[in-house]
């Protein structure tokens, strides 16, 4: 089942990459202002990265993944959606600092081809170093949240957290074996169990576009199976 989910993950990545081309971006190779150690991913995305490194004989890159005071989320995207839908104040994340991503090599990403959604969805219409932050179109921000929620649901038996924690967890052969069997891994410090999709966080002005996107995604098939068998696409 994990193998099939990996194919759906790649399909969602490809769909998003093509959709995002409708928005302007000033990002170029070597522009790494937003490449920090505060990247949040699912275990499914972590497995995608791990297999990529293994297939290319680059597992040694995992030895670089050491950092401190990085972001460890208190809630998953779908938990956040649940809080917002029910008008509950979500818990605040603990304090963290901004430091470069340990993967960065001479300002470039050695896993760019399989970079997680948190990375591929962060690009700016203006140079980040000028204002200190990325400028993203409001519609794309909504679409980014929708995809983040879908990816969490796709990895329904997995975990969510900082990429450093997720990859460290999966680098343990026993943990990886449990996950690949489709079982929910034991609780691990810094990682949160993925939650069901409670509804999408979408402002009224973006609803029609989101419905259109979800309809197109609903046609994705791999190995004779429809993506609807893994994720809920009803708005």
Report the location of each language-model feature.
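Short loop/turn segments that flank or connect secondary-structure elements
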Residues: 1-235
């Amino acid at each position: 089942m994990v193998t099939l989910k990996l194919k759906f993950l790649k399909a969602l990545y490809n769909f998003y990459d093509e959709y995002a081309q409708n928005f302007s971006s000033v990002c170029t190779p070597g522009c790494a202002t937003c490449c920090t150690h505060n990247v949040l991913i699912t275990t499914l995305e972590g497995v995608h990265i791990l297999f990529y490194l293994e297939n290319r004989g680059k597992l040694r890159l995992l030895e670089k993944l050491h950092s401190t005071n990085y972001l460890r989320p208190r809630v998953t995207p779908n938990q956040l959606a649940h809080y917002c839908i029910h008008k509950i104040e979500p818990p605040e994340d603990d304090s963290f600092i901004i430091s470069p991503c340990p993967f960065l090599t001479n300002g470039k990403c050695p896993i760019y081809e399989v970079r997680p959604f948190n990375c591929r969805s962060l690009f700016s219409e203006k140079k980040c170093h000028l204002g200190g932050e990325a400028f993203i179109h409001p519609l794309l921000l909504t679409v980014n949240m929708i995809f983040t929620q879908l990816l969490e649901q796709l990895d329904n038996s997995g975990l969510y957290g900082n990429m450093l924690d997720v990859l460290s967890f999966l680098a343990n052969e026993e943990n990886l074996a449990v996950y690949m069997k489709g079982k929910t891994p034991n609780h691990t410090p810094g990682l949160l169990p993925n939650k069901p999709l409670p509804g999408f966080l979408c402002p009224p002005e973006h609803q029609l576009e989101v419905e259109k996107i979800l309809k197109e995604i609903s046609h994705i098939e791999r190995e004779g199976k429809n993506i609807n068998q893994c994720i809920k696409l009803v708005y």
